[in-house]
């Protein structure tokens, strides 16, 4: 029989050119053999055959333009016939008999035989590795009783002691740092927001629309400008909850929280500032067009927008490392008595793909060792990076949880939204959580690119128990099951718990959907990150999805939407930010100038050394020593040493001004009798970074920008060349 090989769904490769024919008429080919090569303006791809057989005709030629559904070749295939003939007659009869019996049972609504044959498999999977289910049940019941009687802390202590005892007895089985693939905070412990959720959703929707419109308008004018829609679409709720309830601005009475915004989400911050009245429409239309005054930078950077952005967060990996050292520097100043402890927080927003950058995770150990409970990471796990899934065959949330828990961080997972709560409460057999644990990110991504029927089949259909769990739900209900990062209630509870944590840094790992709300144009598809343009149908869908009050003509014009100044939305935005001290992001300074040292402070360096040679490092030490003698400058001097003080003759600073250590010195150093003894103290002035040039540079940036971020001028000095 003749099979037609058509152009499959090839994503962006629409109306593209055939640049190479890889088969010819009469040629025998196998399934998956490449047939033609097509090429767009960005890349090329081969199209494979999905049949085996002989090529009857080639229906395209080099130079032709093809799209999905176009005929490429005809293949003479006897595959179906040979497969049919290979089935023995008696086997075919058995198959027909089985099908007939199955139909009979279905008609009579008697599924007992199917259940009886499948039930042993399910029990075997669920009880895998359990040689004594009764004993297991007794242990679990005992643990539940402890939690009920004495609370979570007692249960945690007993489990820790059991693990220690197992190790002492030689049971050195690797212990996982992972918890089940569910939310960290139980429903009954969630702190509820006092905000108006209806107004907050309307505000969030308008910000989403204006952010997307800004990027689309810019690229309609100049297609080469670029920009990103999908990142902020996935993180809008994460930012909105922080803006409305948690992030306190800097003013003349309070130092303010410090927020490191994820670089690719910048359009969302501009869109919010537009509603706040801090940016106008002309400025939005200058997105990525900084050649003109008032243009908005592609990404956060204080050099480009010195009154707006506080921190640079692109290239990837800069944000997390700089945030860690910023939080440490804040603690350093508090412990030295230079600033008050106001309970300020440093928040850093990161992407799950960004966490592959070595700098993203390279300093998390320091954050735990220094007990930086003023630091909160929020990792937006939309499961996608630029080209595809972050961990298609794995689970990035579980991976990050293990890494951060292992390093000593407080981890809060926000995976499932509120619509999942009843299902999890009714998961008496544990099969729902089991399915959640087993499903890999590639599957989760694909599900959100499909529909409710697909999720019912591919996710809930894995076990009879999970299938039964949603038997009363429609496909629409299943599709409505939301992810935690898009649920303001779950996000609020996580932020509240993170803000109150003491003794360790916190990471909130939130599961979201890249391109959330973009529909077919970009929701949970691999090309989302590159989406800069939306056609009219996409824009109409986006408007309807988020109930943006624009007419069809206004949508076609890609107009921004800003409510009247007296509208409930604008009033609410302003009221929330007034209560939190002002607007964010905003870059200002309240630093007082430092009195300059006297002119003669360096007189001793003007005198010739005669025949005595002096290295540059020697001169530097002398210069710093002179500055440390000045009562105005000395407290503001921050020597930053990446582990080579002794190499360059700077060990004298150890005793003179001390090495900063947040816990002081718990030991007597072996050189305690020496003048240059290694003296650590809580009020120490030297930042001894170890063999860590990136960390030293991060500390230098924190100190060098303290005039604006901490309202205190410092003289920071990396004491050896970096690079």
Model-identified regions with their sequence ranges:
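Short coil/turn segments at beta-strand junctions that form active-site/ligand-binding loops
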Residues: 255-257, 344-345, 373, 503-505, ...
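Cofactor-binding active-site loop characterized by glycine-rich and histidine/acidic residues
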Residues: 195-207, 211-222, 228-370, 393-394, ...
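Single conserved hydrophobic/aromatic residue that forms the stacking wall/gate
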Residues: 713-723
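Acidic, low-complexity mobile loops and tails
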Residues: 1-37, 46, 50-52
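Short hydrophobic beta/alpha edge segments that flank linear recognition/processing sites
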Residues: 30-48, 67-83
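Intrinsically disordered, low-complexity mixed-charge segments
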Residues: 78-97
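Short, conserved catalytic or interaction motifs in soluble domains
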Residues: 12, 23, 40, 60, ...
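Conserved acidic/glycine
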Residues: 85, 97, 102-241, 349-350, ...
């Amino acid at each position: 029989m003749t099979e037609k090989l058509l152009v499959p769904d090839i994503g962006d490769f629409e109306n593209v050119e055939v640049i190479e024919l890889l088969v010819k008429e009469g040629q025998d080919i196998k399934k998956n053999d490449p047939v033609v090569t097509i090429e767009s303006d960005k890349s090329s791809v081969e199209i494979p055959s999905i049949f085996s057989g002989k090529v009857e005709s080639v229906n395209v030629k080099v130079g032709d333009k093809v799209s999905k559904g176009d005929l490429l070749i005809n293949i003479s295939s006897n595959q179906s016939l040979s497969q049919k003939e290979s089935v023995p007659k008696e086997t075919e009869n058995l198959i027909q008999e089985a099908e007939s019996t199955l139909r009979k049972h279905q008609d009579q609504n008697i599924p007992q035989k199917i259940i009886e044959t499948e039930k042993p498999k399910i029990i075997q999977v669920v009880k895998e590795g359990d040689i004594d289910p009764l004993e297991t049940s007794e242990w679990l019941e005992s643990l539940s009783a402890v939690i009920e009687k004495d609370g979570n802390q007692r249960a945690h202590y007993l489990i820790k002691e059991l693990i220690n005892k197992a190790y002492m007895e030689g049971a050195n089985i690797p212990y996982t740092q992972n918890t089940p693939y569910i939310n960290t905070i139980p429903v009954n412990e969630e702190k509820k927001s006092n905000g108006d959720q209806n107004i907050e959703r309307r505000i969030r929707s308008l910000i989403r629309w204006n952010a997307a419109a800004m990027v689309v308008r810019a690229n309609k004018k100049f297609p080469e400008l670029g920009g990103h829609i999908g990142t902020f679409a996935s993180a809008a709720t994460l930012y909105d909850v922080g803006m409305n309830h948690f992030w306190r601005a800097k003013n003349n009475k309070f130092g303010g929280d410090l927020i490191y915004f994820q670089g690719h989400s910048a359009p969302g911050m501009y869109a919010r500032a537009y509603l706040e009245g801090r940016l106008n429409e002309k400025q939005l239309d200058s997105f990525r067009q900084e050649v003109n005054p008032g243009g908005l930078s592609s990404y956060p950077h204080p050099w480009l927008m010195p009154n707006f952005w506080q921190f640079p967060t692109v290239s990837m990996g800069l944000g997390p490392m700089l945030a860690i050292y910023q939080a440490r520097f804040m603690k350093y100043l508090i412990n030295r008595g230079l600033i008050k402890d106001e309970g300020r927080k440093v928040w850093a927003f990161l992407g799950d793909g960004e966490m592959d950058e070595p700098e993203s995770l390279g300093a998390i150990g320091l954050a735990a060792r220094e007990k930086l409970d003023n630091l909160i990471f929020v990792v937006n796990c939309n499961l996608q990076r630029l080209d595809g899934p972050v961990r298609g065959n794995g689970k990035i949330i579980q991976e990050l949880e293990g890494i951060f828990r292992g390093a000593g961080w407080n981890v809060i997972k926000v995976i499932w939204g509120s619509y999942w709560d009843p299902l999890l409460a009714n998961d008496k057999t544990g099969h729902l959580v089991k399915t959640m644990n087993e499903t890999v990110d590639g599957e989760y991504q694909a599900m959100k690119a499909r529909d409710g029927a697909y999720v019912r089949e591919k996710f809930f259909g894995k076990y009879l128990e999970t299938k039964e769990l949603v038997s009363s739900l429609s496909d629409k209900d299943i599709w409505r099951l939301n992810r935690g990062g898009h649920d303001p209630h779950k996000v609020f509870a996580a932020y509240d718990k993170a803000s109150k944590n003491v003794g360790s840094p916190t990471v909130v790992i939130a599961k979201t959907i890249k391109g959330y709300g973009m529909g077919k144009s970009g929701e949970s598809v691999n090309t989302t990150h590159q989406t800069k343009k939306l056609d009219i149908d996409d824009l109409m869908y986006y408007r309807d999805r988020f109930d943006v009050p624009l007419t069809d003509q206004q949508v076609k014009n890609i107009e921004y939407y800003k409510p009247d100044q007296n509208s409930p939305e604008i009033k609410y935005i302003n009221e929330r930010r007034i209560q939190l001290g002002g607007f964010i992001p905003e870059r200002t300074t309240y630093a007082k100038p430092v009195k300059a040292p006297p002119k003669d402070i360096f007189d001793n360096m003007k005198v010739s050394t005669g025949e005595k040679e002096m290295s540059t490092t020697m001169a530097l030490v002398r210069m710093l020593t002179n500055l440390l003698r000045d009562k105005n400058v000395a407290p503001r001097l921050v020597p930053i040493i990446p582990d080579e003080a002794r190499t360059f003759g700077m060990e004298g600073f150890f005793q003179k001004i001390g090495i900063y250590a947040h816990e002081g010195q718990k030991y007597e150093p072996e050189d305690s009798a020496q003048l240059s003894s290694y003296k650590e103290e809580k009020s120490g002035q030297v930042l001894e970074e170890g063999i860590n040039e990136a960390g030293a540079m991060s500390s230098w940036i924190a100190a060098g920008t303290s005039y604006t971020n901490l309202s205190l001028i410092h003289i920071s000095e990396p004491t050896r060349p970096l690079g």
